[in-house]
């Protein structure tokens, strides 16, 4: 099985990066530094996103990822993100908030989808699980926007993530910040920052299914680099 990448040009008819830049420009012209509730999946993906957005937003960085297992892996990723926020210089220092960790939330969501290939419906439901919790928390806290770091990954479907975010905006009445953070060399910059800060870079997304798929690819000599 070959690796599937969502580079943007093939999947996205809208340019979410340009939409984000327009929002940033409008807020800057108005002299606003909006409050952003940012769902973070891991330190490497968050590195560039935090570097970029902290120039324009006051960020609460929300680590809610019940998909990650085992617990030791979850703890390791949590610590790395906390360390990154402590060590990186920021114009507006992000606040770190850890969500609850209950893997049963993920397994209940994935029920019946255990054999669906990576990048399919199970992943889309996982996107929604995490984004919905972020939207709820953002609405409860009176934030101006919510979004996720997930769109930085070449393995994640940015169009689907933005569509889910826009659906949740209508439900929870808090603005979704459009993004495709892999654009403008965002993913490349995240790898540079990961090296600079010596970040732990995991080789699977987080769930048992992605771990199993990664191990199968390794055994067959098929890796995504």
What is each PLM-predicted segment?
Residues 2-225:
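Nucleotide-activated chemistry modules centered on ATP-dependent adenylation/adenylyltransferase
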């Amino acid at each position: 099985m070959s690796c599937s990448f969502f580079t943007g040009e093939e999947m996205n008819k809208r340019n979410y990066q340009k939409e984000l830049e327009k929002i940033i420009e409008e807020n800057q012209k108005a002299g606003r530094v909006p409050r952003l509730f940012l769902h973070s999946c891991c330190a490497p993906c968050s590195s560039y996103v935090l570097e970029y957005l902290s120039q324009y937003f006051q960020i609460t960085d929300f680590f809610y990822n019940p998909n990650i297992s085992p617990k030791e892996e979850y703890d390791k990723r949590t610590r790395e993100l906390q360390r990154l926020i402590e060590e990186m210089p920021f114009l507006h220092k992000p606040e770190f908030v850890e969500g609850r960790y209950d893997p049963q939330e993920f397994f209940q969501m994935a029920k019946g989808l255990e054999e669906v290939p990576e990048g399919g419906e199970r992943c889309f439901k996982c996107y929604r699980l995490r984004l919905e919790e972020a939207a709820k928390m953002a609405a409860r806290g009176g934030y101006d926007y919510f979004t996720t770091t997930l769109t930085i990954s070449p393995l994640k479907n940015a169009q689907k993530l933005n569509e889910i975010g826009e659906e949740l905006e209508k439900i929870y009445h808090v603005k979704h910040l459009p993004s495709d953070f892999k654009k403008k060399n965002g993913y490349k910059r995240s790898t540079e920052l990961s090296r600079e800060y010596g970040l732990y870079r995991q080789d699977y997304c987080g769930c048992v299914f992605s771990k199993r798929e990664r191990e199968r690819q390794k055994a067959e000599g098929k890796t995504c680099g």
